[in-house]
């Protein structure tokens, strides 16, 4: 079977909104008959912990990746990064809705990511449009732009957890229909650092009372104990100068 240049992952909405579910299903159904991409479905990205099989599955994906989720692209990218699913931020042509199109966004002056592999991760916000064709056209554009060879998805499914656990994610329609016996998730609340904007000023670690933040071996700020974060607490984001 020919190798595919791109893997498309749909991260489900945490709600049971029928319009959102319908959009997810239409996208998956279209990708399943597209012989240029692999497609899979995982639970809402924010609710996956480091040991969840959904996280392990995402780590097993080789090559370039398109993530379709109900989050802003920056948030999606850095959620993946903090889980060890790294790559360059792929440029997309989908426009985010903005309250004021004349707002000038300064160039990021952050410390940036580390150990970024030679692949692109394209994060698309499903909230931008309710027409699946908009996203499918963008996926086709990305495929034609990449035109690279990668090893097949199944070749990478090994190790822990067991392959049969990860293979469930390769049957996306059963996941969407609730037929797959997937590991459950619970709603979580924790901060995510955007290292393109973070200047390592340490205001958040100084301000947080709950021991959420720490530093790595390079003395860079990181989220060390995310589940210590108190639900609804916005303190660190408010004190952040960026």
Describe each region flagged by the PLM.
Residues 8-137:
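Cofactor-cradling patches in redox/metallo enzymes
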Residues 13-16, 66, 70-75, 199-210, ...:
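Local cysteine-cluster metal-coordination motifs and their immediate loop/turn environment
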Residues 32, 36-37, 85, 144, ...:
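Generic secondary-structure signature for well-ordered alpha-helical cores
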Residues 178-200, 211-238:
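Ferredoxin-like iron-sulfur electron-transfer modules
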């Amino acid at each position: 079977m020919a190798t595919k240049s791109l893997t498309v992952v749909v991260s489900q909405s945490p709600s049971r909104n029928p319009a959102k579910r319908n959009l997810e299903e239409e996208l998956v159904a279209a990708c399943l008959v597209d012989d240029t991409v692999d497609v899979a479905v995982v639970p809402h990205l924010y609710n996956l912990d480091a040991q969840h099989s959904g996280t392990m599955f995402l780590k097993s994906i080789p090559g370039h990746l398109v993530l379709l989720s109900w989050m802003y692209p920056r948030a999606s990218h850095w959620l993946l990064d903090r889980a060890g699913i790294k790559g360059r931020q792929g440029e997309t042509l989908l426009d985010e809705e903005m309250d004021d199109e004349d707002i000038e966004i300064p160039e990021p002056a952050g410390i940036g990511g580390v150990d970024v592999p030679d692949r692109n991760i394209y994060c698309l916000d499903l909230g931008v449009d309710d027409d699946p064709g908009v996203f499918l056209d963008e996926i086709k554009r990305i495929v034609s732009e990449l035109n690279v060879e990668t090893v097949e998805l199944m070749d990478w499914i090994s190790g822990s957890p067991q392959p049969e656990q990860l293979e469930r994610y390769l049957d996306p329609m059963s996941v969407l229909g609730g037929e797959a016996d997937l590991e459950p998730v619970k709603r979580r609340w924790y901060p995510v650092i955007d290292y393109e904007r973070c200047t390592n000023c340490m205001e958040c670690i100084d301000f947080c009372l709950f021991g959420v933040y720490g530093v790595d071996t390079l003395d860079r700020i990181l989220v060390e104990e995310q589940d210590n974060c108190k639900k609804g607490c916005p303190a660190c984001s408010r004190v952040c100068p960026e």
